[in-house]
Amino acid sequence: MTYPLRGGVALPRVGLGVFRTPRGQTTRGIVKTALDLGYRHIDTARIYGNERDVADGLRDSGLPRSEVFVTTKLWNDDQGYDAALRAFDASLEHMGLEQIDLFLLHWPVPGKRLASWRALERLRAEGRVRAIGVSNFMEHHLEELLSHANEPPSVNQIEVSPFLQQRGVRALCERYGIAVEAYSPLTKGARLAHPEVVRVAAAAGRTPAQVLLRWGLQHGLIVLPKSSAPARLAENLAARDFELSPEAMAALDALEEGLVTGWDPRRAP
């Protein structure tokens, strides 16, 4: 199950997020376990401090590099044209890789995001990264970027769940062919026990987590759940293997409440 990005890049639609996964052997082991279970998409970032561990887990798996999609991100302190290029070099060195599959601007930093984007365009043109995108960009950020960019982002990674559906941003992304990745698709656990989620899950013979992930997949999203438990990793990946009924989707669609569980980029200028 992949999403076709520009340039023939295939993005696996269920990925493993490693935000706040402890550095060192913990992340390394989780990544290897996930890859052994069938994950082929790992999402890290410079600010997470575990880029090297992700790459080590990939190597431990024995899988060919070409079979695993690796995303990392440019942190705020490294934005700006020259700084972004240096930070990318550092990420590549930390990971010991020759190429990154997807490189994202982590946040729409005022006064620097356009110059940072030009750096990402250069990296993609040079073949050092296969696809480029953004994270936490709302409609006004995207409209500004699209009016200045030589090429639009391939991806926008934002928080999305049935409780925070981001319909306006998603519609804009669809208009410009920008894939939407959903981080915190499980609401950091805050709504797994919601009565309607539990009801839909029971009717489908699935878990609440699988139902939330499947909702995202059926809306065309790439979902990035995180877990350190092998059983949960397998459970999340199995969201690919069933389909929710139109009635179940409508019930989940009705749960919008503007729930933000992390950063809120809607307030970013």
Model-derived features: positions:
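Short acidic capping loops at alpha-helix termini that bridge into adjacent secondary structure
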Residues: R13, P64-V68, E98-L102, R130-A131, ...
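Beta/alpha (TIM)-barrel catalytic core signal, keyed to glycine-rich beta->alpha loops juxtaposed to Asp/Glu
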Residues: P108-P269
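Glycine/small-residue-rich loop that forms an oxyanion/phosphate-binding "nest" at active or ligand-binding sites
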Residues: K73, D77-E121
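N-terminal binding-site loop/beta-alpha segment at the start of enzyme catalytic domains
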Residues: M1-V68, T187, T261, R266-P269
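Generic structural signal for well-ordered alpha-helices
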Residues: V31, E51, A55-L58, L85-L92, ...
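Acidic (Asp/Glu)-rich catalytic clusters
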Residues: L5-R6, A55-E67, D89-E98, R122-R124, ...
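Short, acidic/polar
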Residues: P22-L35, G80-M95, L142-E143, L164-Q165
